[in-house]
């Protein structure tokens, strides 16, 4: 069992090193979109399929309450997975359609091969003129295909659902931290 534990830690570290090498530009571009949306008075919506839903909710929470220091809340809403849509696949989309608009941003998280609710949310966001940041994995077969030229994909270099979930959490923390640092640079000096 000791070797198994060491093997899991090694795999975690290797995945993080690969992500650090591959994802820097995409993360910076996503953070810029997020900051620009917030500074221009836009709203940010986020959602995730299955295990990624918890990371989406966490992202909304830290964007509202602050991660690295106390600050005013950012306009971020986690879309509810249990919202009573007539068709389960449209749960997230039905929450975007009434209030999403040009200048808003949708952040989607997906750790699996398919993501019907996330895909319908993306279609709704695109129909409303919104931009999209997608945090995906190598297993993704749907989400990346819906992205436009101005959207951003952060594709985690793994198919292992545990490693992907770990990096999703790390990435949403990073996006929040980068946003805080850009919007409130004076807090870094204190």
Model segments located where?
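Generic N-terminal amphipathic, Lys/Arg-enriched alpha-helix
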Residues: 1-21
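Glycine-rich, small/polar surface segments that engage phosphate groups of diverse ligands
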Residues: 33-100
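A short, small-residue-rich loop immediately preceding and capping a beta-strand
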Residues: 43-47, 102-113
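Hydrophobic beta-strand scaffold residues
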Residues: 44-45, 129-132
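Cofactor-binding loop segments of dinucleotide-utilizing enzymes, especially the Rossmann-like FAD-
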Residues: 49, 81, 111, 137-138
């Amino acid at each position: 069992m000791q070797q198994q534990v060491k093997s899991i830690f090694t795999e975690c570290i290797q995945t993080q090193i690969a992500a650090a090498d591959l994802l820097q530009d995409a993360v910076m571009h996503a953070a810029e979109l997020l900051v620009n949306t917030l500074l221009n008075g836009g709203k940010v919506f986020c959602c995730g399929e299955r295990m990624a839903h918890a990371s989406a909710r966490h992202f909304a929470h830290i964007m509202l309450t602050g991660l690295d220091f106390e600050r005013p809340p950012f306009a971020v809403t986690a879309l509810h997975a249990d919202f009573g849509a007539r068709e389960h696949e449209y749960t997230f989309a039905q929450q975007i359609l009434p209030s999403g608009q040009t200048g808003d941003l949708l952040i989607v998280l997906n750790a699996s091969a398919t993501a019907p609710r996330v895909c319908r949310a993306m279609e709704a966001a695109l129909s409303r003129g919104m931009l999209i940041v997608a945090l995906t994995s190598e297993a993704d077969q749907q989400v990346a295909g819906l992205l436009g030229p101005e959207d951003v994909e952060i594709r985690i270099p793994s198919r292992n659902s545990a490693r992907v979930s770990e990096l999703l959490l790390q990435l949403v923390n990073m996006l929040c931290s980068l946003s805080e640092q850009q919007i409130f640079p004076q807090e870094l000096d204190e």
